[in-house]
Amino acid sequence: MKCPRARVDIFKREIKTRELEPTEKNVYHGLTGPISLPPHNPVSIRFQEMVSWRLRSAVIGFFLLVSSTSGSSAASIPSAPTPDATRESPTGEPHRDRALSTETPTPEPSRDGGSTPEVLHVVTGPVRPRDRDPILERLAEILAETHSLHQLLTPGTGPREDEDEVFARALAAAEIAIGSVADRVMWKATLSCMLVVTSLVFAGVALWVIVARHGHFRVIPHERSRDWSPGL
């Protein structure tokens, strides 16, 4: 039985005496002579064996699904409910569009001498409006604050207050306006950014899987000259 050192010498001798063509691919010239490398990276081969065509199809399909739904979900903005223009009145005639009506809706008087703002008389009779949209409620608050500020700043229209009160009301109106816009926009922008990042990640994974399947990920050292030596 030969010692390990003798086996090392045998391997070195085989490497030095190996005859290879100068134009052969995957040849690395080192200190001991030309060494033939495997045609593919072993890591890439194992990865190709693990990844099947079903997994690649699932990744590509999921990426297409996410990219198609990102635009639609980001563009879907809840709108205020619109009244039903085709609903029939008690007399049997359909309601006309409120926007085309020239009559001004008047509040229905109540028994105590006041008015009931929830019930409005239109062309075809009394109609109770539906629940108002939160955006419209916030806009009504902003208009009310603006009207109060106009009364405070305009002489002769109301009691004058000190500058601190005016500044506080103006700051409150600005906070209401900014909050109403931020609450409606920030979550949509965040959702859109998350969907775009997810789509890019899945696109990169799908592209990497496809390219790795064709064997483009190979770690092959650059071929050096046969005349290379440590002294150069």
Curated annotation (Swiss-Prot):
Membrane topology, as annotated: Multi-pass membrane protein
Keywords: Membrane, Transmembrane, Transmembrane helix
Coiled coil residues, start to end: none
Keyword Transmembrane carried by entry: yes
Keyword Cell wall biogenesis/degradation in record: no
CC terms in the record's Gene Ontology section: membrane
TM stretches of this protein: 166-182, 195-211
Compartments where found: Membrane
Region annotation (Disordered) ranges: 71-121
Extent of Low complexity compositional bias: 71-84
Entry protein name: Putative membrane protein ORF8
Protein source organism: Ictalurid herpesvirus 1 (strain Auburn) (IcHV-1)
